[in-house]
Amino acid sequence: SVGFKAGVKDYKLTYYTPDYVTKDTDILAAFRVTPQPGVPPEEAGAAVAAESSTGTWTTVWTDGLTSLDRYKGRCYNIEPVAGEENQYICYVAYPLDLFEEGSVTNMFTSIVGNAFGFKALRALRLEDLRIPSAYVKTFQGPPHGIQVERDKLNKYGRPLLGCTIKPKLGLSAKNYGRAVYECLRGGLDFTKDDENVNSQPFMRWRDRFLFCAEAIFKSQAETGEIKGHYLNATAGTCEEMIKRAVFARELGVPIVMHDYLTGGFTANTSLAHYCRDNGLLLHIHRAMHAVIDRQKNHGMHFRVLAKALRMSGGDHIHAGTVVGKLEGERDITLGFVDLLRDDFIEKDRSRGIYFTQDWVSLPGVLPVASGGIHVWHMPALTEIFGDDSVLQFGGGTLGHPWGNAPGAVANRVALEACVQARNEGRDLAREGNEIIREASKWSPELAAACEVWKEIKFQFEAMDTL
């Protein structure tokens, strides 16, 4: 019987295609699927493929007006997750035609849209995406990338140093600018607006921008080094955000900042385009990421958010610290750090990388290590992240007993000591504490910092097994 047959049929009849050979132009997704009891994994995987592409809950007359074979998502492989009784990794291939060019927003609306509320699934998590070269090429990506940033700043062969200004809320613009100046004068490369500093009653954005610019230029003149402060342009509307970025450019400062998840991908991509056109670097904070990536079984892994940011655009992004965390997390963090920085990343399941990713020369993003780190962590951070990173010490600078500038000196001395030791062939993993102790002999600022944070231990043995 030719023609339209109404009724509800199993998704797996149309959307589960184990024989499908993936195309180079397909977007590939790895989902961690936890079906409701009694729902077979093939049906669950097919349901995800259907709901995130062309399907709906019943057959519809209009299906006959298009070629589903050309446009449907396909669940092409299912693997049980080791150690979990009812959980599977379902691989889905999406034809490229389903997505608008150059739009992370559209990509996510499809892939992580309705399917996540689907009743037949207990939970659903997107673990990784393979972005085909053909789609990557529709994105501008980071405004400048790692090499251009180094050339702009004239800083080579070491990680960059930053510091988030605290207390994050409540300082007046002038006192805020003073804190920025002290840190930069002491030897940091960057200071940072906290992610929640936008434009509040105690400090309006324009006043902050002016005082921070003054701090930047004064400290540059004194130190002979290029300095920057991440001026947070995040705002309630895209127009206001761009207005703030324009003012930053008029002041002649080198870098602005955006909260890309709360601000949204559309706003972020607009800002990234503005930054490239106007020579501004763009620092990205990931506020709200844990709402999306914290649950093991539901949501989206941060590596997907990191890939999306590289497509949308940003020159720096916060990426965790690794230090003192568990071993597995270290490998997985380094996995998405490589996805941010490198041009080509091989599939490696032990590091959470489900697909080989070729970025076809899209500029790289500097990972930012921030949160709870201090001078004793410096050898570990230098070893783990290497030169292409930004190490941010908020409390680890401002908590110095003698003040911000000595705190900055302590961090810079510790970093330079670690880089020199590494370049001389010493083993940072084994000799880290010794290297810091030696350096503190000729730097009273570092000695004072070592004293304050000496009680805070961290696990360093694990490094040897990497």
From Swiss-Prot:
Places the protein is found: Plastid, Chloroplast
Binding site residues for substrate: N114, T164, K168, R286, H318, S370
GO MF term (any one): magnesium ion binding
Keywords, in A-Z order: Calvin cycle, Carbon dioxide fixation, Chloroplast, Disulfide bond, Lyase, Magnesium, Metal-binding, Methylation, Monooxygenase, Oxidoreductase, Photorespiration, Photosynthesis, Plastid
InterPro entries: RuBisCO, RuBisCo_large_chain_AS, RuBisCO_lsu_C, RuBisCO_lsu_C_sf, RuBisCO_lsu_fd_N, RuBisCO_lsu_N_sf, RuBisCO_lsuI
EC annotation from Swiss-Prot or TrEMBL: 4.1.1.39
Residues modified as N6,N6,N6-trimethyllysine: K5
Active-site residues annotated for this sequence: K166, H285
Positions where N6-carboxylysine occurs in the chain: K192
Family the UniProt entry places it in: Belongs to the RuBisCO large chain family. Type I subfamily.
Name this protein carries in UniProt: Ribulose bisphosphate carboxylase large chain
Lineage: Eukaryota, Viridiplantae, Streptophyta, Embryophyta, Tracheophyta
